[in-house]
Amino acid sequence: MHASRTCGTRTPPASEGLSRRRAGRPFAAILDKTRITSAALEIIGRKGYDGLTMAGLAKQLEVAPSALYNHVTAKRDVLQLAEDHLISMVDVSLFGRAPWEEAARIWAWSYRDVFAQHTSLIPVIAVLPVTNAPQTLEMYETVTRAFAAAGFPQNLIVSSIVAFESFIFGSAYDVTAPDDIFEAGSTVDSTPHFRAALKAGRVNERPADTAFELGLEALIAALARSLC
């Protein structure tokens, strides 16, 4: 009796059934903070900070906005993720292993180079609280510990870090400044001294690097003198 009920009915192989169940379900990468950060930086790189919206970010990730809000609650959270990701790329490896001047030099050059590629984020990140930004806080802890060990007065350590960052962020803009930024145009005859200095400075192949090195060495030297 059992055989007669199943007669003429083909039982599909397990693999066929699995294939059918999967039809119409394309593979989707797992949404996590790493993907969110990468997508946010891509949008900011194309459209600037103002072009980053939660709706646009969800669209870039090909997810519903509700899925995005399972990981971040607002645009500010996304910016903190972006900040922390960029800061994690800054080289602090020499702090605690080399003289503070050498470590600060490598740190500053690395810091500038990272943010020269993301200048649209500087106005936001420069004033963004570091709450819940572990990589950023770890960087500050590393630099603070090294400065304290070098003899920096504790009440001046944070001010010293801010002095570095103020210079670094401004210099990051200089890396991408247009070549004709100092051209005087129709008023050229009224600035003969500046014009001569500008012409002389053109011998420098990488003027942004020359300016950064000049300012960085002056800052390090001034801080070193204050420790004497």
Where is each model-derived feature located?
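Helix-turn-helix
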Residues: 35, 39-77, 81
